[in-house]
Every structure is written in structure tokens, then in C-alpha cells.
UniProtKB/Swiss-Prot annotation:
CDD domains: HTH_XRE (cd00093), S24_LexA-like (cd06529). It comes from the Bacteria. InterPro entries: Cro/C1-type_HTH (IPR001387), Lambda_DNA-bd_dom_sf (IPR010982), LexA-like (IPR039418), LexA/Signal_pep-like_sf (IPR036286), Peptidase_S24_S26A/B/C (IPR015927). GO terms for molecular function: DNA binding. The keyword DNA-binding applies. This is Uncharacterized HTH-type transcriptional regulator HI_1476.
Length: 239
């Protein structure tokens, strides 16, 4: 069965979610979080290579159709075995690498607060990957293996960082320097803020100062504060 108009990835995911009787069942069978599925359906993120393979296996579609929308949705007896399909997916990924694109682990399930703080429970593994130009990474002076991608939630860093902006974070840059922007964690809360060392602790400073005053962390709490990494690039939506 051909789906000639299924050339939009969010539409294909929407179709497969419906095919499995809704997001909850889709999440249960694929092992993907509901928040990640929501981002796929909205077109805010793309699945990793391993998730593409898992979705194809669970839903009975080919990886080619899932990735491109240009071939038959239903598998047939004339199709090559699954191993060949997986090989093709790896070949396409290799082609991207040869073209100067690196795939960087992303954490769409982590709620990074550009506000007053967020709660994230037990989230430590990446749930996707995002492509970044090697030329851009070189210009930023960072290495793909040291980076991860997160998304901002809130308006405290306006106008520098908008709500839902994609942030490239260098996880190797944990030393506080100047008024640079960092991802910081205190317990289960993760913020994106400017970080300033004070004589009695640390101040987390928002760019939207009128609505979000500095957060002072002192004493033992300051010692427990962890610098996840420095934000080195921000991706704004134009719509």
C-alpha cells in the first residue's frame, strides 16, 4: 500500500501512533517516553537511529518509509530481509557523516527551566539525536563527543533564549567563567542561567531580570550545585 502524501515525518509518526491505538500504547511498545513522542508529532525533534529501527520493528513498516516516506509502507515478501534495511539505514547515516554532519545526543525528556526551576526524575539517558554541521562545531571550538542537546522551557532568559529554543551544551566546560550561560543542576532541578560566584555562594542570573530576580544559593546547597555544561549555541524558531 503506497502512502504518496506521507512525506512529512510528524504525519508518519501520527499515522503510526494511531495504528497502535494511541500514544500510551505506542510508548509502551517502543519504549519511548510520551514527552519524546509528543516532540516527534510536533516536528520539534527527530528519533535516533536505534529508535527508527525499533519503531519499524514494532509497527511493521520499513525503515525507508519511516525515514523518507517515499516507499511502500507495508512490508512484502519481496522486500529484502530486515538486516539489509538496517544496513541501508547505517549507510545513510554514514553518508551524512561523510558530508560533514555529526549526530549529537539529545535529551528532550529533561525539562530545562528558563524560569523558576523544574523537576526531573531519573532521567539520565539520551532519547534522541540531532544533526549539527561539523563546520559549525569547529567554529564554536567544541567537539561533538563532548556535546549534548537540550530544550529551554520558560521565558526567564529572554531575549537571549526563547521558550522551546534548542540549546547545544558543551558538557566538558564546567568551569564558571565571566557571565556565560550554563546548564546547572541542584537536586532534581535543572536551570539554564548565567552563573556568578559570590563570597557566600552562587547566584543564578536570568536575562529577563524584570520578571525573574537572581536566585541565591548559599552554604551546603551551593556545594551541591552541579554545572552540567556551558551553552555554546542556541537555535531559534522563526515561526
Amino acid at each position: 500500500m503506497q502512502y504518496q502524501n506521507q512525506d512529512n515525518f510528524p504525519e508518519r509518526i501520527e499515522y503510526l501512533v494511531d495504528k497502535l491505538n494511541g500514544p500510551s500504547e505506542f510508548a509502551r511498545k517502543t519504549g519511548v517516553t510520551l514527552s519524546t513522542i509528543t516532540r516527534w508529532r510536533k516536528g520539534e525533534a527527530d528519533p535516533s537511529r536505534s529508535n527508527l529501527v525499533k519503531i519499524a520493528e514494532v509497527t511493521g513498516v520499513s525503515i525507508e518509509w519511516l525515514a523518507t516516506g517515499k516507499i511502500k509502507e507495508e512490508k512484502t515478501t519481496e522486500e529484502k530481509p530486515a538486516g539489509s534495511l538496517v544496513s541501508r539505514a547505517f549507510e545513510r547515516m554514514q553518508a551524512m557523516l561523510e558530508e560533514g554532519v555529526s549526530m549529537i545526543d539529545s535529551y528532550s525528556s529533561i525539562n530545562v527551566s528558563a524560569g523558576f526551576g523544574s523537576f526531573n526524575e531519573g532521567i539520565t539517558q539520551p532519547d534522541g539525536q540531532e544533526p549539527y554541521s561539523d563546520e559549525l562545531l569547529t567554529s564554536l571550538g567544541v567537539k561533538a563527543d563532548n556535546c549534548a542537546v537540550f530544550w529551554a522551557n520558560g521565558n526567564s532568559m529572554l531575549p537571549t533564549i526563547n521558550n522551546y529554543d534548542q540549546m547545544l551544551v558543551d558538557l566538558s566546560r564546567k568551569e564558571i567563567q565571566g557571565d556565560r550561560i550554563y546548564l546547572v543542576q541542584n537536586g532534581e532541578s535543572v536551570w539554564v542561567k548565567r552563573v556568578k560566584m559570590e563570597w557566600d555562594g552562587i547566584s543564578l542570573i536570568s536575562d529577563n531580570k524584570e520578571e525573574y530576580p537572581p536566585i541565591s544559593i548559599t552554604g551546603e546547597n551551593a556545594q551541591n550545585l552541579q554545572i552540567i555544561g556551558q551553552v555554546v549555541h542556541i537555535g531559534h524558531s522563526l515561526i
